[in-house]
Amino acid sequence: MATDGASCEPDFSRAPEDAAGATAEAAKQDFDVDALSKSELRMLLSVMEGELEARDLVIEALRARRKEVFIQERYGRFNLNDPFLALQRDYEAGAGDKEKKPVCANPLSILEAVMAHCRKMQERMSTQLAAAESRQKKLEMEKLQLQALELEHKKLAARLEEERGKNKHVVLMLVKECKQLSGRVIEEAQKLEDVMAKLDEEKKKTSALEEELSTEKRRSTDMEAQMEKQLSEFDTEREQLRAKLHREEAHTADLKEEIDKMKKMIEQLKRGSDSKPSLSLPRKTKDRRLVSISVGTEGPMTRSVACQTDPVIESTDHVKKLPLTVPVKPSTGSPLVSANAKGNACTSAALVRPGIDRQASHGDLIGSSLPTVPPPSATRVEENGPSTDSAPDLTNSTPPVPSSTAPPAMQTPGAAPQSHSQAPLHSLHSPSANASLHPGLNPRIQAARFRFQGNANDPDQNGNTTQSPPSRDVSPTSRDNLVAKQLARNTVTQALSRFTGPPAGAPPRHGVPPSGDVGTYPPVGRTNVKTPGVARVDRGNPPPIPPKKPGLSQAPSPPHPQLKVVMDSSRAPSAGAKVDNKTVASPPSSLPPGNRVINEENLPKPTTPQLPPKPSIDLTVAPAGCAVSALATSQVGAWPAETPGLNQPACSERSLVIPTTIAFCSSINPVSASSCRAGASDSLLVTASGWSPSLTFLLMSGGPAPLAGRPTLLQQAAAQGNVTLLSMLLNEEGLDINYSCEDGHSALYSAAKNGHTDCVRLLLNAEAQVDAADKNGFTPLCAAAAQGHFKCVELLTAYDADINHTADGGQTPLYLACKNGNKECIKLLLEAGSDRSVKTSDGWTPLHAAVDTGNVDSVKLLMYHSAPARGHFLHEEEPESGVCGLDGGEGSPEGTAKPVVPADLINQADREGWTAAHIAASKGFKNCLEILCRHAGLEPDRREKCNRTVHDVATDDCKHLLENLHAFKIPLRISVGEVQPDIYCSDDFECENTICILNIRKQTSWDDFSKAVSQALTNHFQAISSDGWWSLEDVTCNNTADSSIGLGASSVRSVTLGNVPWSVGQSFAQSPWDFLRKNKAEQVSVLLSGPQEGCLSSVTYASLIPLQVLQNYLRLVEQYHNVIFHGPEGSLQNYIAHQLALCMKHRQIAAGFSCEIVRAQVDASFSKEQLADLFISSACLIPVKQSPVNKKIIIILENLEKSSMSELLGDFLAPLENRSPESPCTFHKGNGTSGCYYFHEHCFLMGTVAKACLQGSDLLVQQHFRWVQLRWDGEPMQSLLPRFLRRRAVNKFRGQVPSPCDPGCKAVDWAAAVWRQLNSCLTRLGTPEALLGPKYFLSCPVIPGHAQVTVKWMCKLWNAVIAPRVQEAILSRASVERHAGFAQTTAKKTPSQGQQAVVKAALSILLNKAVLHGCPLPRAELDQHTADFKGGSFPLSIVSSYNCCSKKKGENGTWRKVSTSPRKKSGHFSSPTWNKPDLNEEGIRNTTTSQLNCNRNASLSKQKSLENDLSSTLTLDQKLYLGSDDEADLIKELQSMCSSKSESDISKIADSRDDLRRFDSSRNNPTFSATVNNLRMPVSEKEVSPLSSHQTTECNDSKSKTESGVSRVKSFLPVPQSKATLCSQNTKRSSSSSNTRQIEINNNSKEEIWNLHKNEQVEKPNK
């Protein structure tokens, strides 16, 4: 039957083939396959394929059915479990019932079929086994190949090390050459410094010699001046004696003449003549001989023009009739002054006050031919400076006066006729005229002039004058004598002028203050010509350059003679008025018109005891009302500065004075100002000058003198600030104190304009008119306000001056003060209640004037200063209601107070339609415009007459201000929502960061607002994710959709405007301006998508880990279920795990699953039973009999490094991989029970390990988890810290990317560099357990403009975190090596001295190399912080002085201590961190320290030096030893710390000497040597920079020769000191955890020994 079944199978197997063939034949008959299209072919193939599949199914079904029928028929009656029993039953049944036939043909065939099947299966299994064996053999062959490759790799590695050694040797040679070159450079620099020092010394010597030379010059000048002074005094005395002789001779001649006359009179009396009434005695007529000729109101008068060398011209008067017996003496007149000369005379003023000649009778005057009086148009003197068409001649100008205006000379008997044109007329500006203006004139010379000019009228002790004989009738002899005596007197004056004037050709000196001044004047508008030879040296002034000798001087006589008026009819013709012989001259034309009154205090001399001490005044020409001087004894105030004021002069448009007369009997020479009646009686001046009062009666003997000249003098005193003179004039009765000149200037006006407060007070007390205006309408208050005299303004307002008075042009005092920017005056006027709204004729208000000048303070006062109650500000210097803080400080009023001016005044337009804002904008006064814009009522859209707005006329800066005028500034901030990372301190992490300030204007639309928000976010993300300090322009130019960290506008979840939610692109009915104002939104907050939305954008922004990296981590967790994050401590492992768990939780919740997060802190006491309970309680471990729960669990095991992971997780590794009920495991609970459990399929396990690398048994766990390594030198950790600190800086700068030059930015870059350099050094040091993540540096403070705070923070971090970790890592490594080397069971509680030395050396290296390198602080500031760092004072030369000797001989390595100053004790290097155990005697004996004598003292043996060392205090810093060889490996680690990777940095370190900080524990400490005999490892190049920061001195042994001893400073390169053979063959291998490569060096290798210290001295030790 088996054969039948077998035969049937082929039939069925062929059935599908037959069917397919039939179908194909039918298809060929029906259609042609080649003619079908592609779609029809596809359809045909699919139909045929379906038929084939259906046929196969039918065949299989028929076969199965046939097989079932066959078995049922054959074995249906039997149990087929055991075929042998069935076979036995068949036989039994067959024996019993032979008639029955068995169903099966042969049961044995069935058994054979079964056995054949078994054999087939056995063959198949053998085949598979053979294949497995072949695979195993192949695997073994691969292993052999791998071993061969490893051997080859080792060979290559060894060859590579050899090449590195060769390269290192080459580098050492190059470094040696570099060091030599650097030494040469230092020598050249030292030479250059010496040369520069010598040059400085030479310069100092030269300057000292120059000072001595100048001192000698001054001394010689003083001596020469004194000699000149003595010569001039001698000349003066000679001329005095000569003049006295001439006077005596003249007097003798007069007496003879008088005798003759008396004889004639006796004869006449005898004859009984009737002429007695007409011949009166001189004493009777003496009091009537002084004639005062009035001007302006009287009839025409002749002018007498004469020089002292010219014939005398008689002048007559037709108006004032005198008796016939009164003769009038011809007087010396004033020269005519040209129209272009500066003067101050009124138009109709005659300039001469003629005296009375006793020799001429009235009949002679009448009988004489009278000259024609020139018309006013011809004699008028131009006022207020020269005319526009002619300028004054400064040398020798002759005025263009027509000959008809000159009075003809009268012919007198005996007098030579001389025309007026022959007299040289000089301008007042000529140097010759100026030459006689000598305020510093020698008092003896002045006395001589007084003596010769007024000796006949000198008062005696009783105040009486010497009297002359009575007058005689006119005779030719007397006229001749008159001319002769006049010539004699002129000759004396000419002689005196020769040495009182300057040398010929000497120009006048401008701006030199007179030595006799008491008041201090600025040199504005001032010119004074001093006599160089006789300056007042007692005032402290340096002696001037001496003039030429008077005897050699060729200066001509003064062309403008002294004007003298005869006072007494009884005088001799040769006697003149007693006046101060000082010629009046005007200043040069370059000066502004103004009276110059120069105070000179003349001290009495022993040679002239008859002259009492009296002040003398020289008057120069200036406009009346503008003279600014006073008596030296009564000077009040200072010369007012030349400030912008009124456009017109003080008096009128043309107002200058011509000096015409000299006051009688006084040292004061007043100029007649605006009046020609200055010749009136000056009794007040006589009294003021200190002369006897009896002279007043004598001077006024001609009758009562009118007060017409008094107002002029009053104005002069007020303008000059002469308080004494002014008070005397005010006490005079009948004086009109309100008198004003032609221009309307009163005395009060002049005093107020020139700022003489005391004069203003005197005039106001005298009831002067306070509001008297000039012809232009300006009052004294206007003048004071315009000139800025706020004291005068205060006085005038106190006396109820009209503060709102308007001049002819509408100018008020407030307007004038604003126009000139006088802040104090504006303040006083506003407090007095001045009206701000008064307009001028041009429509300008005071606000227009203030803005026009651009004075911000004036504008602020007008805008914000309110007027207090009237009358309370007079005695308050600073009213409390006034404006404070005009400089814009914290007290600035515009920030708190509201403007007091109305909107109408702000928008007031002038005649052209311009407002104050138009003026400020057009002139570019941005500050003024900003103040105006703060007023709510300002209308910037107001148009002027040309239809232009403020914006149209504004400059670019002002346009920008106007465009942002009404911008609503609102901050845009980013919020990270619920992301509150536990890795950040609360103070270090900002939940919200201000990224920019949005300017919302009225015309801003919602589309613009959306674009602005999106653009701001994009720029911010680009800025914080960039590699450097990008500016916003760079960010905009580099604009992309997303930043490098994956954030963009799509990362925003929502935006809130204040408290109202808003999304980008959304619009409201109101504009953004109105919406934000209405809702009082203070900020715009942007919330990023976070884990709640199943997104990681907020986590990316908070941690600054790129979004793609976080998404990759999340994918790993979801895919592998078991993930561990590991990295150095502080690498944010816990934070990343927690945030990923949150994101997964919210994703599962969104998918409809419940999810739970379980966090567990693992410590050393955490057992696997507790972990099992945790898994069971969180439904992570499920009992076998229990069905799994429908929720997902996320378990986070934090800090797994604190326990043994192999012990803790060992029992859970297999169940974690096979999570199903089929593979349960038995776990023990914490309560002692146990059970079978399996892990939930949807359980996620995450762990965190704060360890850089795994060691030992923990490696067994590694293959069962997916590990995510967070390396400090790879992404994402490498860029996290710079990005985080950069974002903090942007937040501190209010969203603006700061400049890289900012100290705060430099501190940020430095902090990030410290973190990288520190980890780099720790890696090479072989202490990976001391590596730090960026967490500790995230708290770095960022303060704009300051870096000191960052340095202090770094010091605290170093002392609290970094230094303890480094110490612990190095000591733990040392203890591990000690345990491995000597199998010690107990570790020392305190580290050995060698270990402490290694720790200190490591800290010093790290501090100098990693932390302080590149600090942004200057060297001086950084030195102040170095003492606060731990480990910065360790002498690194000790590290390299360790000698490694053979272990077999039992010799220990020693620390050699060398001190150049054995008297100095220890303590130069402080190390407060570690304990210093006292060394016992045995330990001391074990130390074989030897002292090397730098002074070549070879007599001391090593034993004595050792005993000397032991007798002194033994400290850890100076005397260190190593008791075993394990410290040698640590020293080896230190020396090879910077071996290979830092070779390229040596040039960088050597060049950046400013960045390299050296820390000396003491500036004057003895330094240490580094003499090395045997050392196994060289010091690498990069180790140089920190090691060279300590002062060491190289000392040789007693036989070596030291070099010059000059220390070479500022050397950054190590110098190989000696070649030494290294005796150690066996070097210890470092632990497996060390990343530092150790090199085995044989006995014959030679290495360079590095000498590393600050002051390097290269010495060659004896071999």
UniProtKB/Swiss-Prot annotation:
Residues 1-26, 203-225, 359-440, 454-478, 497-615, 1449-1490, 1579-1663 are annotated as: Disordered. Keywords: ANK repeat, Cell projection, Coiled coil, Cytoplasm, Methylation, Phosphoprotein, Repeat, Synapse. The modification Asymmetric dimethylarginine is found at R498. SMART domains: ANK. Residues 1624-1638 have a biased composition (Low complexity). Residues 1645-1663 have a biased composition (Basic and acidic residues). Residues 606-615 have a biased composition (Pro residues). It is found in: Cytoplasm, Cell cortex; Cell projection, Dendritic spine. Residues 119-276 form a coiled coil. The keyword Cytoplasm applies. One of its GO terms (cellular component) is dendritic spine. ANK repeats lie at residues 709-739, 743-772, 776-805, 809-838, 842-871, 912-942. Residues 385-396, 418-435, 1586-1595 have a biased composition (Polar residues). The keyword Coiled coil applies. The modification Phosphoserine is found at S1524. CDD domains: bZIP. InterPro entries: Ankyrin_rpt, Ankyrin_rpt-contain_sf, Cortactin-binding_p2_N. Interacts with CTTN/cortactin SH3 domain. Interacts with STRN, STRN4/zinedin and MOB4/phocein; this interactions mediate the association with the STRIPAK core complex and may regulate dendritic spine distribution of the STRIPAK complex in hippocampal neurons. Activation of glutamate receptors weakens the interaction with STRN and STRN4. Regulates the dendritic spine distribution of CTTN/cortactin in hippocampal neurons, and thus controls dendritic spinogenesis and dendritic spine maintenance. Associates with the striatin-interacting phosphatase and kinase (STRIPAK) core complex to regulate dendritic spine distribution of the STRIPAK complex in hippocampal neurons. This is Cortactin-binding protein 2. It comes from Rhinolophus ferrumequinum.
